[in-house]
Amino acid sequence: DKNVLPFRVDYIKTMDTDKEIDDEMVWDINREKAMMAPQRISLVTKYMLEHFDQKTYRGGKTYVFNSLTNIAEVASDKKDAVEEVKQKQRISGFNAIFAVASVPMAKLYYEEFKKQMAADPRRKLRVATIFSYGANEEEADGILDEENSEDTSALDQNSRDFLEAAIKDYNEIFKTNYDTSSDKFQNYYKDVSLRMKN
């Protein structure tokens, strides 16, 4: 019925093979090191910035959407006492989520996005980061523990400082006042979620 966005996977060729080199079987590679290589992170970020409009249908067809206009108030509401105020708006394109495997990787990508966007003002996106503080490891039954998005007290100091700086960037973009304290962090988490839907 054309009411669902298509799911599309792009495969990008990342390397050529030399026919004159004998291929040798190995047990495995250091995947984490390969995925977190600065050159890889730089190239992936560059690709996303260059193709963001195309992949999210920016500048293409428009549609009418009931946008939430009081996001900060709704995010700060503890008892669902604030009524959502929505307004019909014509919108072009969709928002995007970029998920990575670890907090250190999230930090590297966040910094790389900031660096590349500062170097090329034509490629400005509103980038936020959020991550859980727990060890998102599988339990013996194969099920992941629930993350507790309401508390940052278990974050190591480096991660908390990083998240505090990222939230400060977010506050500057959206004129909000969040931080990593328990109540304000929960509201930041909700605010990011609401803006993604909007």
Q: Which residue ranges define each predicted feature?
A:
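Conserved C-terminal RecA-like helicase domain
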Residues: 33, 39-43, 47, 51-198
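Surface-exposed beta-strand-to-loop junctions
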Residues: 22-29, 88-90
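Surface-exposed beta-strand edges and their flanking turn/coil or helix-capping segments
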Residues: 19-24, 142-145
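A short acidic, often aromatic-flanked loop/helix-cap motif at beta-alpha or helix-coil junctions
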Residues: 14-18, 135-138
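Conserved P-loop NTPase motor "coupling/switch" region that bridges the ATPase
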Residues: 1-4, 25-33
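Alpha-helix boundary/interfacial micro-motifs
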Residues: 18-20, 118-119
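Post-DEXD/H (motif II) to motif III coupling segment of the RecA-like Helicase ATP-binding lobe
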Residues: 1-17
